[in-house]
Amino acid sequence: MALFYLLAIAAALLDRVTKLLAIHYLRDGAQSIVIIPDWLKLTYAENLGIAFSVRFLPPTGLLFLTLAISAGVVWYVHKSNNRSPLFLTAFGLILGGGIGNLIDRVMLGHVVDFIYFDLYHGALFGIPLDLWPIFNVADSCITIGACMIVLFHEKIFTRKHA
């Protein structure tokens, strides 16, 4: 169980530190920082929605939804008897990412995003399109945790019979 909380705290702290750096160095109209030309750059963005900046609830609603999901993850992990490292890692990453974005919503009223894979920027049928959204460390943790659950679901959720 310690692994679950340790990963959640580490993910939330890493997310917070990177967002503070993004706020300090990228906000206020600063130029993007190119990491890999034509591929990866750091660009400041304020996200009032959820993934892909989708807005389906007002900011207060998203705050409470994030809080409810985070509480649900903690409840589920505690209720489950599963203590496999994969299970605890996946859900620890999801919780840490949720807490990281929750901190932003409480403190700022939006989520700070700054990682941008510039895979395609143009138009599709005349509609402006960026192939990949700007995201953050918390989003990455949530995505990695969810992918672990999908990819390793048999190992994570199959009970061993004695």
Curated annotation (Swiss-Prot):
InterPro entries: Peptidase_A8. It is found in: Cell inner membrane. The chain crosses the membrane at residues 56-76, 84-104, 132-152. Belongs to the peptidase A8 family. This protein specifically catalyzes the removal of signal peptides from prolipoproteins. This is Lipoprotein signal peptidase. GO terms for biological process: proteolysis. It comes from Chlorobaculum tepidum (strain ATCC 49652 / DSM 12025 / NBRC 103806 / TLS) (Chlorobium tepidum). The active site is at D113, D139. Its EC number is 3.4.23.36. It is a multi-pass membrane protein. One of its GO terms (cellular component) is plasma membrane.
